[in-house]
Amino acid sequence: MSNIDWTTLYCIVDAFCKEFEPHWFKTLLTTSVRHRNREAGLCLSEVMTIVIAFHYSKIRTFKHFYLQLLAFHRDLFPGMMSYSRFVSLKKMAMIPLIAFTRTHMSKCSGISIVDATPIVVCHNKRIFSHKIFDGLAKRGKSTMGYFFGFKLHLIINELGEILAFKLTPGNINDNKVVGELSKNLVGKLFGDKGYISMKLFKELFKRGLKLVTQARKNMKPRMMEIADRLILRKRSLIESV
């Protein structure tokens, strides 16, 4: 955790929350059901700071990260509570975290890489007994086989910086999402063989975006610029984001 600049990170997040929260609260629905309004020990900006800092750390699981923070760095967040209490509190930060990510995405440089990765919510044998994401998660297929859950569609630039992202049910075809995700991009978009589609190529080309993919084994050889071949070899960069 020594590599994390906590003060700078918190100031950035807190400045965002001061702008975001007033607008967010106006959109929240009210209910006649009365709830206990017990004050949380941490404010929204503190919760978001802890969640974001975890992704900058080298610790594998969030539980170990939080317990270490609780044991050795409690002075940074005096209002810290138990791990189980924080997990229940973390839910309130989901929408603000998505908004924060969207406001801090990078700009298109002319070279973009697209890919999708499965987010599995349970083992295939437990699909019918799964309740948490019932009605939301769907069966899908990836290069690793069939899964039950969601798909994270991601576009980055050549530096590994996020340009666009979207979470969909697992049964959504990757090509159906590319058009929406790439609406603000120009130049070249590099993808794997799963994005081969003449319809998608023409759609993107009309907007000034050229889709570049590798050819399948059963396809005829085609001419490709050397620079494009080299960038396709670096496409694995997106898998490390």
Model region roles, listed by residue range:
Residues 1-241:
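Short alpha-helical elements
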